[in-house]
Curated annotation (Swiss-Prot):
Organism: Aquifex aeolicus (strain VF5)
UniProt keyword annotations, A-Z: Ribonucleoprotein, Ribosomal protein
Similarity section: Belongs to the bacterial ribosomal protein bL36 family.
Cysteine pairs bridged by disulfides in the record: none
Record's protein name: Large ribosomal subunit protein bL36
GO terms (BP aspect): translation
Top-level division of the source organism's lineage: Bacteria
UniProt xrefs under InterPro entries: Ribosomal_bL36, Ribosomal_bL36_sp
Amino acid sequence: MKVRSSVKKRCAKCKIIRRKGRVMVICEIPSHKQRQG
């Protein structure tokens, strides 16, 4: 899980979602997981 100021999709399977007021990217590829900090 990377914490970034700007989260972007890195591939076609990445999805941008909101959980508990945080913007996150979830993906099958573990290195693509991101969270906005």
